[in-house]
Amino acid sequence: MGLPWYRVHTVVLNDPGRLIAVHIMHTALVAGWAGSMALYELAVFDPSDPVLDPMWRQGMFVIPFMTRLGITDSWGGWSITGGTVTNPGIWSYEGVAGAHIVFSGLCFLAAIWHWVYWDLAIFVDDRTGKRSLDLPKIFGIHLFLSGVACFGFGTFHVTGLYGPGIWVSDPYGLTGKVQSVNPAWGVEGFDPFVPGGIASHHIAAGTLGILAGLFHLSVRPPQRLYKGLRMGNIETVLSSSIAAVFFAAFVVAGTMWYGSATTPIELFGPTRYQWDQGYFQQEIYRRVSAGLAENQSLSEAWSKIPEKLAFYDYIGNNPAKGGLFRAGSMDNGDGIAVGWLGHPIFRDKEGRELFVRRMPTFFETFPVVLVDGDGIVRADVPFRRAESKYSVEQVGVTVEFYGGELNGVSYSDPATVKKYARRAQLGEIFELDRATLKSDGVFRSSPRGWFTFGHASFALLFFFGHIWHGARTLFRDVFAGIDPDLDAQVEFGVFQKLGDPTTRRQVV
């Protein structure tokens, strides 16, 4: 036929059997990729330190999605929460990966069958004897089935009625585990951070889908609407399907980037807004203040801060710090976190406590400035020493560590004080191993950043695809340059399928 690459899909335009075949093959490719990617990630994943080297630091992409749906154990004997397991059962990480690969193989065979046996009686209209699809009826069937799946997921899987539940955590990502979730039917169900909304929304949306599916199966569209929306044309289906997909892609890009109950920080890493707003820093200070109020010493109060909480309060875990095109995991950037050095508290020679101004998200470099409790600049690391008034040496700044590996250690040497002041710009200070992976010291984004960028990009692309195919199907007669009511048509553009011998033609 000699079709150009951008027009090859016309071969399945009037061929329902092979249209099904290529869609089944597409499903085979998607499921096969998911299963294969899961096996690859399991081969390279190190589960030994879920606190300082979690899945999102290692660049895992499909493991977090399995985990949020209730998979926590591996046939390798480890659990994502850090313990060991003896009998993970079929629904382990490897079991899910294997199920996807088996399903992919079955879809591959089904696609071949449908490609070979394309001319089935089910595709033939009894009234005309020609191949055609009852698209409104098919729409009703798909709506009904997707409604059943949606309702079933919310009713059984999420609630734990028949299933594991989903990953649920506290607001600071410290106590996450898989558990059953009760539907939230009140106004709290609309809070994107309330897990109960996931159950209730799936139940409600599934119910609506079932009812809408039954409606479309039992009620035929009015003739005017059928013709106006070109419901008999398969390209209408393509256009509206693309619309559904790009809308969903925009929504999940938002829930991933801004955070929600569906994207827990323990699985995907913190959001950039948690750094921007000092979210974890405030919680750490609240806990320390509570400890001091209970007559604990500063050292005791800081020592009770969970290492996991301190690690979230580090700019290297901010997904907006990694460039969009810097390949590799976070561990390949600043290195593998080994331990928390502790919280540095700086003081000048007059005994005032000084706070290092933290680096904003979109800065690569930032001046080292130390302010007192009132926000007044008291010390800095000057660019020009000749003009300096607030240098560490002049002000006599010292640093002492509380909690962590350097608990109780203090430094007054200006070079060391400046070193830790620079590191304090980046949040809590951690020892990072850059040798093991030959990490280059340049920040990388987390899977949260990749997912958002990918889905926002494809959503934009699919938006234009929706406009393109929607315009093509609505204005097909205009683009072809022919009155659709003409009895004969001979011009190239109006043929639905190139080389179709059934297209009526006559020599003019």
Swiss-Prot record:
Gene Ontology MF term list: chlorophyll binding; electron transporter, transferring electrons within the cyclic electron transport pathway of photosynthesis activity
Family annotation (SUPFAM superfamilies): Photosystem II antenna protein-like (SSF161077)
Location(s), subcellular: Plastid, Chloroplast thylakoid membrane
Gene that produces this protein: psbB
Cellular-component GO terms for this entry: chloroplast thylakoid membrane; photosystem II
Family recorded in the similarity comment: Belongs to the PsbB/PsbC family. PsbB subfamily.
Entry membrane topology: Multi-pass membrane protein
Organism, as annotated: Citrus sinensis (Sweet orange)
GO biological process: photosynthetic electron transport in photosystem II
Residues spanning the membrane: 21-36, 101-115, 140-156, 203-218, 237-252, 457-472
Keyword vocabulary terms for this entry: Chlorophyll, Chloroplast, Chromophore, Membrane, Photosynthesis, Photosystem II, Plastid, Thylakoid, Transmembrane, Transmembrane helix
Family matches, as InterPro entries: PS_antenna-like, PS_II_antenna-like_sf, PSII_PsbB
Tree of life domain: Eukaryota
CC cofactor note: Binds multiple chlorophylls. PSII binds additional chlorophylls, carotenoids and specific lipids.
Complex and partners: PSII is composed of 1 copy each of membrane proteins PsbA, PsbB, PsbC, PsbD, PsbE, PsbF, PsbH, PsbI, PsbJ, PsbK, PsbL, PsbM, PsbT, PsbX, PsbY, PsbZ, Psb30/Ycf12, at least 3 peripheral proteins of the oxygen-evolving complex and a large number of cofactors. It forms dimeric complexes.
Protein name per its UniProtKB record: Photosystem II CP47 reaction center protein
Keyword Transmembrane: yes
Known role: One of the components of the core complex of photosystem II (PSII). It binds chlorophyll and helps catalyze the primary light-induced photochemical processes of PSII. PSII is a light-driven water:plastoquinone oxidoreductase, using light energy to abstract electrons from H(2)O, generating O(2) and a proton gradient subsequently used for ATP formation.
PANTHER family per record: PHOTOSYSTEM II CP43 REACTION CENTER PROTEIN (PTHR33180), PHOTOSYSTEM II CP47 REACTION CENTER PROTEIN (PTHR33180:SF35)
